[in-house]
Design a protein with these regions (language model features):
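Helix-loop junctions and terminal segments of transmembrane helices
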Residues: 65-81, 150, 249, 267, ...
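Hydrophobic alpha-helical transmembrane segments
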Residues: 129, 159-211, 380-384, 398-422
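Membrane-interface junctions at transmembrane-helix termini in multi-pass inner-membrane proteins
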Residues: 138-163, 350-379, 420
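Alpha-helical transmembrane segments of polytopic membrane transporters and translocases
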Residues: 36, 47-64, 233, 248-249, ...
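Interfacial segments at transmembrane-helix termini and the short loops linking adjacent helices
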Residues: 12, 114-131, 258-260, 298-299, ...
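Helix-terminus/linker motif at the lipid-water interface of multi-pass membrane proteins
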Residues: 31-45, 177, 242-273, 291, ...
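Membrane-water interface segments that mark the loop-to-transmembrane alpha-helix transition
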Residues: 14-26, 52, 64-114, 299-320
């Protein structure tokens, strides 16, 4: 099979389809769980769980110091240069960094929660302490999963964390509700943390077996300082690319009631089905882009990106149309009080459409080594998000939060597109993709 057929639209679609199916399945299970939780314990208690879990996700993302998003570039380079020792060293040292930092972050956050219990939603520390206990587990799951993605072991990368864990969480929580008729954020967070522990341990052993079968047993090479220099800018990129919903939930927590947080989160999670599709395409094309850029095959790189952008944009347009027609019934599944979030959901879906139109600009900047140029972009986006939330949310509530997401997404997508054109030398937007038909 030649390189061109390997990177064709059908190949991208085929590779992305599995990742997309895993992520959509996981998202659907999570949505079903949140629908059930909204009915079993109410929007207010659901809001407490969402805020606690959002803190877990965000702190886990910060804890890896950029090692996780840097994995594709570092392992891609090691594979291109045939340096198995570098792969062994990165897997070992990266795991050590992630574990030590995440434990430190979790302990520090737990101490703050104990001191500030009276200011927490519901004035209870238990869900937050459990969420912080899960921070090291989730950080390790993310790091190990990205190593699997670098080798295109998509089943290992996505099935345990995206499908099996949410499915078991749903089944166990449902069983607890059926047998006790009582449920709260603390119980759900306890089950979530337990399943993360099982997932992290299983991934560790599966990944070790895979690496031993794939990589020659050479002495480990360590370039820790260089890896951190690569990873730290990517950390800020990944926060916006993958954890912005959790960031928004945390910003909203002190400003609106927990039931409104639950409505915003439900609207955002539905809109993020579009992002799952885009992420699935990125998961398949990012390792390919890293190798093509390292090999200086710019024309083939642009062709791969053009096909990926077309696929992502067409899927996004279709999804927005579906949400416009069926959005209210979908939100109504959570409960009658959630239907008011339809306008919010459409604004959030529009933000994902903007992102798809720009093309995979974020992953392109990451895997081509231009992540340093993104620092000012996402630092500005972070400041803009905070300012807009404090300006718009007090007056417009969750609609103001959705407009914040749209404006911030438009800003960083446009800015990154210009950087890709100038630094990578290709035009990834949908306008160029269709112009080249």
């Amino acid at each position: 099979m030649n390189a061109r057929s390997t990177y064709s639209l059908s190949a991208i679609f085929g590779g992305s389809a599995f990742v997309f199916s895993c992520r959509v399945t996981g998202a659907a299970l999570t949505l079903f769980l949140q629908i059930a939780l909204a009915r079993w314990m109410g929007a207010a208690e659901l809001g407490i769980y969402i805020i606690a879990f959002s803190w877990c996700v965000l702190l886990a993302a910060v804890s890896h110091l950029g090692m996780t998003p840097a994995t594709l570039r570092i392992i891609g380079r090691a594979l291109a240069e045939v340096r198995p020792g570098l792969i062994w060293g990165f897997a070992e040292r990266g795991g050590q960094v992630v574990f030590v930092v995440s434990v430190t972050v979790a302990l520090s956050a737990s101490l703050l929660v104990i001191l500030l219990t009276d200011r927490l939603p519901g004035s209870t520390a238990a869900p937050f302490l459990l969420a912080f206990a899960a921070v090291p587990l989730l950080a390790l799951i993310s790091f190990q999963g990205m190593i699997a993605v670098a080798f295109r072991w998509f089943k290992v990368a996505f099935l345990p964390s995206e499908v099996f864990r949410p499915a078991l969480l749903f089944l166990i929580v449902a069983a607890i509700w059926i047998t006790t008729s009582e449920l709260n954020a603390t119980v759900v967070m306890t089950v979530q943390t337990s399943l993360m522990f099982v997932t992290a341990v299983a991934l560790f052993f599966i990944l070790r077996l895979g690496l031993r079968a794939e990589i020659a047993p050479e002495p480990s090479e360590y370039e820790t300082k260089a890896w951190l220099r690569i990873g730290m800018p990517l950390l800020l990129i990944s926060l916006f690319g993958h954890y912005f919903p959790e960031f928004m939930v945390i910003l909203l927590g002190p400003q609106i009631a927990s039931d409104q947080v639950a409505i915003f989160n439900a609207s955002y999670r539905l809109a993020l089905l579009i992002a799952f599709g885009l992420g699935a395409i990125d998961s398949f094309t990012a390792p390919v882009a890293a190798r093509l850029f390292a090999a200086k095959e710019v024309n083939e790189l642009e062709a791969v990106v053009r096909r990926a952008t077309k696929l992502g944009f067409l899927c996004s347009v279709t999804a927005v149309a579906v949400f416009a027609v069926f959005g209210r019934p979908l939100l109504g599944l959570f409960g009658a009080e959630f239907v008011v979030g339809h306008g919010t959901m459409m604004i959030l879906a529009a933000a994902q459409l903007v992102r798809s139109a720009a093309g995979p600009v974020m992953s392109l900047m990451s895997v081509t080594g231009h992540q340093d140029h993104c620092l000012v972009v996402f630092a500005s986006a972070l400041v803009a998000a905070v300012i807009l939330v404090f300006i718009l949310v007090p007056t417009y509530g969750i609609h103001g939060a959705a407009v914040t997401v749209l404006l911030v997404t438009l800003g960083w997508s446009t800015w990154l597109h210009r950087l890709v054109v100038s630094q990578v030398g290709i035009r990834p937007s949908i306008f160029h993709a269709f112009a080249r038909v």
